Amino acid sequence: GTVNPLHELARRARAVGARFVVDASQAVPQLPVDVASTGADLLAFTGHKMVGPTGIGVLWGRYDLLEQLPPFLGGGEMIEIVDMASSTYAPPPARFEAGTPPIAQAVGLGAAADYLSALGMENVAAHEQAITAYALESLKAIEGLRILGPDVPVDRGGAIAFTLDTLDGLEVHPHDLMQFLDSRGVAVRGGHHCARPLHKRFGVQSSTRASFYLYTTPAEV
């Protein structure tokens, strides 16, 4: 749930000649994001985390960089000229969209984007911050619970990862906690959350993550 300093990370990447790729799947649904101003060379996010359908996402990239990338799938619409001896590829983005597109998912993603725009991303972000602040204060009161990352809402999105120890100092495995909470009708996730190296950085095997969104109420927290 940490809000990362993208401009500083972009500067460091450029200083060593590296490409800067941003996974914004958690940020785009929750915060106003001006993609072009992030300093990213490539930025991606998914539909299902922003009240959209599964099976679709967005990749934004600098056009000059996209032109250098070869296609990763073959099929209709991604070629420019084909003969028996050679072929050339269509310019971006067509070269990356081979075959029949996910039409229903694209319509659903567009509807989700329109819905969030109508709500106002500033309003979504304000709600997220209020819910996250309430959750942080509630979690801090639990003995043996350790919050991973910043403990103030201004530096976080609507996700909080934590570990839990018993009063005897024994670690409660996130999968056990997840199953226990599930039996009480509470949905959390246990594991690495696609970030195993980060867990090693924090010195923990795995964690439990509670995620909040625009429909979450204080009573549910």
Predicted regions, residues:
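Pyridoxal 5′-phosphate
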Residues: 1-221
